[in-house]
């Protein structure tokens, strides 16, 4: 248990249920397993917090009665001496693009608002086997196709640090729920930044695993090359807990010693940043250096990493329509792609028209060229990291702080400069998606306006355990950020 978890736990008995909200998932589960408090008491505290923060619009569906009933069942199991799972009694919000049998899965779009999957997604089944309770389905950018979670059908998700700003997307509801202490751990999904951007903008941690590390069945797709389910949490130990369950890997992951750790900083992903983002992120790197981490600035090799976003964009645009149509057929959603398209909100439809549909659909030649470029870039990144003996690459998750709600095509920063959204939000997260890297996001600090800034630490594909071990160490050095303002 880390220091913040320990402090929260010691306050529980004396300060009522408010202190429960500060516990991480692993700490809360351990306390419930010991009988320090009941699952029903814990679930009630989280549901009351969700009510306090209702104006964030984090949840699409929230069945309070079902959550409390499941919590009581968990308590009864413990009283009877039954086996308790690693997520015993833990309510977990689930992004509404991930199939759940008990609740509708809308993917944030009107035509699927009544879709009831016949089975849970694979990852939900694994969490349930360990005692997790589906707390509800979280709001998101429509079809998971966007970076703001400004959903025109079900309403915009709002950032707990500033209600006028976006929490990022597309997993904005999951991130807002974790940031606002409605739950310590949530299920999200990342095609092109949809875990990492919300983690950064909401001041929490997130993990995009290597492609294929977790089961991907029952998750509404955009691209077969890039879609990846993953966790959002306030503490890295909870990302580790999720990983061990979802990857079916029981081995412990311990913090990586700082001695000998090498972090490479690719200049191309630090160019033209919002000055406040750069200031906060540079200060975080300085703290790592002071603690003994070897931080290596790379000005020459690896400069081509900024090409990744364009490659990802071409592949996603080529695969999206077929991927969505195939999912709708296989899961008997009762809706065809054309029907779904007809009911899209304007910001999603405009993006679809500009990227995916004729005459803008990438040609077969362009698609195949992008796949070749992807493979070449992956080889180049691996070679560059070996050359510099880098354990991870480090760069700001986004060029900007959280956009204001309504900034869909461009983000205006201090001084009046507007950065195209493709660059502002998509450039840096493109690398991890394109190369299939194991990537963890940690809070670096807060800008002068109080908004969080996150750094992505990206390791080579297959290096998930190493990246999580590094994350456990770096989290302690960076220290996290203050949570959003308390609501009584």
Q: Where are the regions a protein language model picked out?
A:
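Short, hinge-like loop/turn segments at secondary-structure boundaries
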Residues: 152-155, 202-206, 313-317, 411-413, ...
């Amino acid at each position: 248990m880390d220091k913040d978890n320990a402090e929260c736990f010691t306050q529980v008995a004396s300060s009522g249920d408010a202190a429960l909200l500060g516990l991480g998932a692993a700490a809360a589960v351990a306390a419930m397993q010991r009988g320090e408090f009941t699952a029903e008491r814990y679930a009630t505290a989280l549901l009351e917090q969700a009510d306090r923060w209702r104006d964030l619009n984090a949840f699409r569906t929230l069945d309070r009665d079902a959550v409390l009933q499941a919590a009581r069942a968990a308590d009864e199991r413990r009283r009877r001496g039954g086996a308790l799972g690693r997520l015993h009694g833990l309510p977990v919000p689930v992004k509404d693009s991930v199939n759940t049998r008990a609740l509708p899965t809308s993917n944030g779009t009107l035509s699927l608002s009544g879709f009831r999957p016949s089975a849970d997604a694979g990852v939900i089944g694994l969490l349930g086997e360990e005692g997790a309770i589906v707390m509800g389905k979280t709001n998101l950018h429509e079809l998971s196709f966007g970076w703001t979670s400004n959903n025109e059908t079900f309403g915009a998700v709002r950032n707990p640090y500033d209600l006028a700003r976006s929490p990022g997307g597309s997993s904005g509801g999951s991130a807002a729920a974790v940031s606002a202490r409605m739950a310590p751990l949530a299920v999200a999904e990342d095609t092109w930044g949809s875990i990492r951007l919300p983690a950064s903008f909401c001041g929490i941690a997130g993990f995009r695993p290597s492609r294929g590390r977790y089961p991907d069945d029952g998750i509404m797709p955009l691209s077969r090359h890039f879609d990846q389910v993953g966790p959002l949490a306030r503490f890295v130990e909870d990302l580790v807990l999720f990983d061990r369950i979802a990857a079916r890997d029981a081995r412990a992951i311990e913090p990586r010693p700082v001695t000998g750790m090498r972090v490479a900083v690719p200049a191309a992903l630090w160019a033209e940043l919002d000055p406040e983002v750069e200031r906060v992120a540079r200060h975080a790197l300085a703290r790592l250096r002071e603690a003994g981490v070897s931080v290596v600035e790379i000005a020459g090799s690896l400069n081509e990493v900024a090409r990744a976003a364009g490659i990802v964009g071409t592949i996603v645009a080529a695969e999206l329509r077929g991927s969505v149509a195939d999912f709708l057929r296989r899961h008997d959603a009762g809706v065809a792609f054309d029907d779904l398209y007809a009911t899209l909100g304007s910001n999603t439809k405009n993006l679809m028209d500009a990227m995916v549909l004729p005459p803008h659909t990438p040609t077969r030649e362009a698609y195949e060229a992008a796949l070749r470029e992807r493979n070449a870039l992956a080889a180049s990144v691996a070679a560059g990291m070996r050359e510099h003996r880098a354990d991870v690459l480090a760069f700001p998750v986004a060029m900007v702080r959280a956009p204001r709600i309504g900034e869909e095509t461009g983000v205006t920063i201090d001084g009046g400069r507007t950065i195209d959204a493709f660059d502002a939000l998509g450039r840096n997260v493109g690398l991890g998606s394109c190369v299939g890297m194991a990537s963890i996001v940690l809070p670096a600090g807060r800008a002068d306006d109080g908004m969080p800034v996150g750094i992505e630490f990206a390791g080579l594909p297959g290096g998930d355990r190493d990246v999580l071990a590094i994350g456990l160490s770096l989290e302690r050095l960076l220290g996290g950020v203050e949570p959003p303002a308390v609501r009584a």
